[in-house]
Amino acid sequence: RFESVDFHPRPGFNLVTGANGSGKTSLLEAIHLLAHARSFRGRVRDGLIRQGQPSLDVFAEWRDRTDTPHRAGLRHAGGDWEARLDGAPVSHLGQLCEAMAVVTFEPGSHALIDGGSEQRRRFLDWGLFHVERHLGDDGFLALWRRHARAHKQRNALLRQQADGAQLDAWEHELAQAGEALTRCRERYVVQLAPYVEAGMAELLPSAGGAAIALLPGWRRQELPLADALLLSRDRDRLLGHTSLGPHRAD
């Protein structure tokens, strides 16, 4: 929509107004793009470049909670991406995602309420990616990847009808990572709950209040994940995938 735009938001609430088609969404999309390395409109990267232009560029300056200044830039030209953070080249776009904590609500965000559980897990984990940096070993992202890898390996072994010894090793890893992942999600839901309740009371007072809680993806109050995986092993062999665990959380 724009050839060039400078936007200088103030701390706190900023309201962007304009007629239909004036570019309000394009402005928000640029901010989202810099923080997520993708558009909230799906896989439309090539369509983001203005017709007749070789590339798009997004640049931002901000200060974090310690008042430390930061600078980030992203360039997309055809199939190539180039990014810089605080003057240094970025080796992978995830570094921009980590540096900029941006949560976007757009027309498709209603899926958080009426969509499948995958949308809600993604929302939780995106928040945790930014707030659980104290975990060590690269923080929450490393834990999430550890769980995803173990989950993928167990599924592969189930499809191969692997023996118990092979499954034991990966179930141990999956259980350890899965329990830790679930504890992170539970803490985050507890932190989010007051904001959800206050927001609902203000926006929809007639609804009678709201509450959020985490369904961990297995009967966690009855048995640890390691035991649940062992008990479900025969059924999961028939299914060819893991039927319970944090990947089924809601």
Go through the PLM ranges and name each one.
Residues R1-A19, H32-L33, R45, R75, ...:
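Conserved NTPase motor "head" modules and their coupling/switch loops across ABC/AAA+ ATPases, GTPases
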Residues G108-L204, G217:
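An accessory alpha-helical subdomain
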Residues G23:
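Conserved glycine(s) of the Walker
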Residues H32-Q119, L124-D125, V131-G136, V190-A201, ...:
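Nucleotide-state sensing region of NTPase/ATPase domains
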